[in-house]
C-alpha cells in the first residue's frame, strides 16, 4: 500500500499539472493520489467491486488515509480524477529494449452479461454497448482495443462498441505507432485495402498470419503474438472482465486502473501481483 501510494504520488507530481487541475483554491484534504491508490488496491485484494476494495482498505489500515471520504463521495471523486489515471500511463518509462518499432495489436471483448441474457440485456446500451462477434462467439458489450510493445508493455488503448471492426479500432490508435513500424496482428486485421491504406498514410506495416507463406515464419508470428494474449490474461486476472459499472465513464475508469496497475508491474515499478 505504501509503495503503491509513493509511486502514484510521484507520478502525479511529475505531471505538468499533476494534482493541480482544480480551478478553485479549495484543495481537498484527501489527495488525488489517495483516491486513485484505494481503487488500485482492487488488483491486490482480488475483489469483484470497488466497494469491497474500499471497505477492505479501511478495515485493514484505517490510519493510512485518515481523511478518506465516505464511499459515495470517494467514488464521485474517483470518476472526476479518472483522466489522471489515463495520463499517468504515459508517464511510465519504457525499458530501452522495448523500443524497437515492433508492436502487437489486438482487441478484447468486455462482456456486459452471459450469453443466456442476450435477449433481455439493456446494461449500458445507451452508452454504446452492442453485440459483437469474437473468437469465442457472440457477446454483448464493448471492445478494448490495445497496442503494446513486442515485450508486452501497453502503449495505448481505446474502448469502443462491441460491433466496431478491429481495423477501425486500430485506426484510432495509429498515432501511438512510429513511422516504419511493424504491427503484428491476427486475422481480424487482414485485408489488402486496409493494410495498404495504413502503410501509405502512416508508414506502418500490418502483418497477419495470412500474409506469411513460410511455415517457420508462421510459427514465429504465433510465438510473438502469445505476448498480447498474456496482456489480456493479466488484465483478466485483475478482474477486467467482470463488469459492475453502471456507466461508460465508470467502466472506462475501471479499465484504466487495471491497465495502470499492469503497466506499473511490467515496468518493475511495483512487484508483480
Spans of features found by a protein language model:
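Short alpha-helical elements
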Residues: 1-273
Amino acid at each position: 500500500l505504501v509503495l503503491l501510494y509513493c509511486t502514484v504520488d510521484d507520478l502525479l507530481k511529475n505531471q505538468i499539472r499533476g494534482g493541480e487541475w482544480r480551478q478553485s483554491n479549495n484543495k481537498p484534504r484527501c489527495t488525488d493520489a489517495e483516491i486513485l491508490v484505494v481503487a488500485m488496491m482492487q488488483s491486490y485484494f482480488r475483489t469483484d467491486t470497488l466497494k469491497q476494495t474500499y471497505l477492505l482498505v479501511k478495515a485493514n489500515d484505517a490510519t493510512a488515509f485518515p481523511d478518506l471520504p465516505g464511499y459515495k463521495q470517494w467514488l464521485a471523486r474517483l470518476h472526476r480524477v479518472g483522466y489522471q489515471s489515463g495520463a499517468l500511463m504515459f508517464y511510465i518509462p519504457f525499458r530501452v529494449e522495448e523500443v524497437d518499432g515492433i508492436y502487437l495489436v489486438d482487441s478484447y471483448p468486455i462482456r456486459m452479461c452471459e450469453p443466456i441474457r442476450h435477449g433481455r440485456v439493456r446494461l449500458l446500451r445507451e452508452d454504446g454497448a452492442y453485440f459483437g462477434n469474437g473468437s469465442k462467439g457472440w457477446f454483448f458489450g464493448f471492445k478494448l482495443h490495445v497496442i503494446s510493445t513486442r515485450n508486452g508493455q501497453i502503449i495505448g488503448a481505446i474502448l469502443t462498441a462491441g460491433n466496431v471492426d478491429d481495423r477501425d479500432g486500430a485506426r484510432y490508435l495509429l498515432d501511438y505507432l512510429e513511422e516504419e513500424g511493424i504491427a503484428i496482428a491476427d486475422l481480424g486485421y487482414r485485408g489488402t485495402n486496409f493494410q495498404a491504406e495504413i502503410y501509405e498514410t502512416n508508414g506502418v506495416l500490418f502483418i497477419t498470419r495470412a500474409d506469411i507463406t513460410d511455415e517457420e515464419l508462421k510459427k514465429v508470428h504465433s510465438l510473438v503474438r502469445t505476448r498480447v494474449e498474456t496482456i489480456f490474461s493479466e488484465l483478466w486476472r485483475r478482474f477486467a472482465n467482470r463488469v459492475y459499472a453502471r456507466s461508460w465513464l465508470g467502466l472506462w475508469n475501471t479499465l484504466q486502473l487495471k491497465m495502470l496497475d499492469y503497466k506499473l508491474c511490467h515496468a518493475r515499478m511495483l512487484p508483480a501481483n
